[in-house]
């Protein structure tokens, strides 16, 4: 099953620009992963795998995020290990290194094993929507699509131009249901649309 959602990122983009002016440069993808881990901790069913042989759902205490990446020989999914223990800057640095190694065919087997949840950022390719394929035996895969400038209604009921990103999450309906998926993405969207929420989570 696939659930579709969107997030208005103007506040996040402005905050990232402010951080860059202060000498802290990082990709939006790194912020996505940092906040995604917080949402996964609150909704652990999505940080699980299905052991079909033993008919058991295994919840994981480790947060190993698979990064769907274009490589010379096709799609590959290196794994960012222990994402919950890393800062946004550390995540950004490790993501760039894993991507570089993937594009240069330098990944080792251990770099591809152990993922508990996968994220695919296809926005730079121009995608505005798709039904992603789950990286079994994981429970879900989240695809991030293109951010587009669109008219939005602000909190004070004004019309403004916003930076709207669409996303789609496919999940194994044997493990999680639609209500759980909506609650999970709603929590993540809260932190995307209001980056101050991340600060509150880390206090």
Report residues per predicted region.
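C-terminal catalytic/motor cores of large multi-domain enzyme assemblies
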Residues: 1-203
């Amino acid at each position: 099953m696939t659930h579709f959602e969107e997030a208005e990122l103007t506040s996040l983009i402005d905050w990232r620009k402010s951080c860059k002016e202060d000498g802290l440069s990082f990709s939006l993808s790194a912020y996505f992963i940092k906040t995604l881990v917080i949402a996964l901790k609150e909704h652990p069913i999505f940080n699980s795998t299905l052991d079909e042989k033993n008919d058991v759902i295994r919840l994981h205490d480790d947060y190993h995020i698979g990064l769907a990446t274009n490589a010379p020989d096709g799609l590959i999914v290196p794994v960012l290990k222990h994402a919950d223990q890393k800062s946004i800057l550390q995540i950004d640095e490790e993501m760039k290194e894993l991507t570089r190694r993937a594009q240069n065919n330098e990944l080792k087997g251990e770099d591809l094993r152990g993922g508990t949840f996968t994220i695919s950022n296809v926005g730079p390719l121009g995608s505005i929507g798709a039904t992603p394929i789950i990286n079994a035996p994981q429970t879900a895969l989240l695809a991030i699509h293109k951010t587009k400038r669109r008219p939005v209604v602000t909190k004070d009921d004004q019309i403004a131009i916003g930076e709207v990103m669409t996303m789609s999450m496919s999940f194994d309906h044997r493990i999680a249901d639609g209500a759980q998926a909506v609650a999970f993405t709603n929590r993540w969207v809260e932190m995307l649309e209001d980056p101050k929420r991340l600060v509150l989570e880390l206090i």
